[in-house]
Amino acid sequence: MLIRYRKNYEKIAMGLLSFMPTEKELKKLQQTMKHYETNDDWQLFLWKEEEDVIGIIGVVLRAGQVEIQHISVNPSHRHQGIGKKMVKALKDLYPNHEFKANEFTAAFLEKCGL
């Protein structure tokens, strides 16, 4: 189930984001989290199954557009379709928006058929 990021999930969110190639350094990771926490057009969502948060997807909302900035799944839950489920849930949440990828999410989104 896709849920909106809340501050009490910060450590989990940072851990999941750290799997992204661009988020390896702590300072960069902290800057990214600050963007999501302070900019209304930056939205961060977590994927929860039962009581476990196992995935994260971050987007920038622009006029009629959703640009996927970050997508990551806990390594022990990969290759189970979690990433695709997160993208589908986002498309259900923003049905009238065009979805775009950035250079780091493009290959994955292409596999999802976007």
Report the location of each language-model feature.
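Conserved acetyl-CoA-binding loop-helix of GNAT-fold acetyltransferases
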Residues: V73, H79-D92
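Conserved beta-hairpin
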Residues: D41-G55
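Short loop/turn motifs at secondary-structure junctions and domain boundaries
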Residues: H35-N39
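Conserved GNAT acetyl-CoA-binding A-motif
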Residues: L93-L114
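Conserved acetyl-CoA binding element of GNAT-fold acetyltransferases
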Residues: Q65-P75
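Short amphipathic alpha-helix that is part of the acyltransferase structural core
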Residues: M1-K28
